[in-house]
Amino acid sequence: MLKPVDVAVLLYLLRHLRESFAHMSAMLGISKSSAHGAVTRLERAGLVHKLSEGGARVAHGPALEFIQFGVPYAFAPELLPRARGVPTGFAALGLSSEPDAPEPLALVWPSRLGESAGVGIKPLVPDAPDTAWRDPQLYRCLALVDALRTGDARAREYARRVFREIFEAARVGST
């Protein structure tokens, strides 16, 4: 059975095909055994293929379908009280400035490092607020996942379209 951290690992693997488990765990703020376990679960689910030389390749079609339509149901959002933290969903930096993006949602991952106020949401990865500073592209993907998990129909469709573009760019870049 997949765990929430597996979603972050899957999104990380889109751009980091042959990264070591040590590097992945440092970037995501998880243990090496958690990173390895996530890749094993993702492989069992048919969302990645382990490479003989190390690392894993994302199965783009199934992974995109899972992100777009499975994650919002498998990992329903856990809303928290108002908090100060790191913006997520459409309140995330860079997402609300898209020309055809829906109005931003005031969602934050609670964190002492954050400077935004809003409704708290439990992140898929406990270290997600710190991940925002370490890997801005992964932060954008995790924020889009939260938009899928919490947004209205228009917001979800916008997030799906952006994910299609991200997965297509990753597919082209990995060939």
Segment roles from a protein language model:
Residues 43-54:
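A short, conserved structural fragment
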Residues 74-159:
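Exposed, interaction-prone assembly regions rather than primary DNA-binding/catalytic cores
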Residues 13-16, 42, 145-151, 163-166:
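Generic structural signal for hydrophobic core residues of well-folded globular domains
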